[in-house]
A protein has these predicted regions:
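Conserved acidic, metal-coordinating active-site core of Asp-based
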Residues: 64, 68-187
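Short hydrophobic/aromatic-enriched beta-strand-loop microsegments
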Residues: 30-38, 94, 140-142, 191-194
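Short, intrinsically disordered, charge-balanced linker/junction segments flanking boundaries
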Residues: 1-2, 109, 191-194
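Structural motif
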Residues: 28, 187-188
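Glycine-rich beta-to-alpha transition loops that act as phosphate-gripper elements at the mouths
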Residues: 14-15, 173-179, 193-194
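Active-site phosphate-binding/coordination module
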Residues: 1-89
Length: 194
């Protein structure tokens, strides 16, 4: 609040999906936010963009998972809903650890999905190295049982926000508290505080 009162532009930057981060944004009185791992931009409380994952990369990952009998779920919108054609993911690794609405439909055709925001694979750490399409998209492992593909470009989100604001990049000061914030730290561009 003191930074805002002093005339500074203040912005939350998170890897979380927009729908998840909104509560925190409002609770801590941020009008502006970079979310969805750098792919979402909220300006003055309004979601301006929320770019999905690269579709071709997503399709390759899901196809390989299906060929190898690996359960998958996909987030195709900005909500806690995940979609799949069966419950193979749940059979293999159990339910996800966060609030989730499962929409499982044998007629679900992932090739007809317009946008993918996250992909969850029932792929443990030992199998991960042999998954050929892993590098098609950024991935993170918060749970040992499954691998999650989601945007991971908070630094890119900072660039987008500054471009929208038409503000100099060297004015940026970032604060981070964990390894997932390292992407934002670039001493050659701006000031970072850990």
């Amino acid at each position: 609040e003191k930074l805002k009162q002093a005339g500074h532009f203040v912005c939350l930057n998170t890897g979380r999906a927009h729908y998840k981060a909104e509560k925190t944004r409002k609770e801590f009185n941020f009008e502006n936010m970079v979310c969805n791992g750098g792919n979402g931009i909220v300006l003055d409380g309004i979601l301006k963009e929320n770019i999905p994952l690269d579709k071709q990369g997503a399709l390759k990952i899901i196809q390989e998972a299906k060929e190898k009998g690996i359960g998958y779920l996909v987030a195709i919108n900005d909500s806690q809903e995940v979609y799949g054609e069966n419950d193979l993911f749940i059979q293999q690794v159990g339910y996800r650890k966060e609030p989730t609405t499962y929409i499982l439909d044998q007629d679900f055709d992932y090739t007809q999905v317009e946008n993918f925001y996250k992909i969850y694979l029932a792929l443990d750490e030992k199998e991960e190295a042999s998954f050929q399409n892993k590098d098609q998209l950024g991935s993170l492992r918060f749970e040992k049982e499954y691998l999650m593909f989601q945007p991971d470009n908070k630094k890119g989100g900072i660039f987008k926000m500054m471009e929208i604001l038409q503000a100099p990049i060297q004015d940026v000061v970032v604060f981070g508290d964990d390894y997932n914030d390292l992407d934002m730290f670039d001493k050659d561009l701006w000031t970072g505080v850990a």
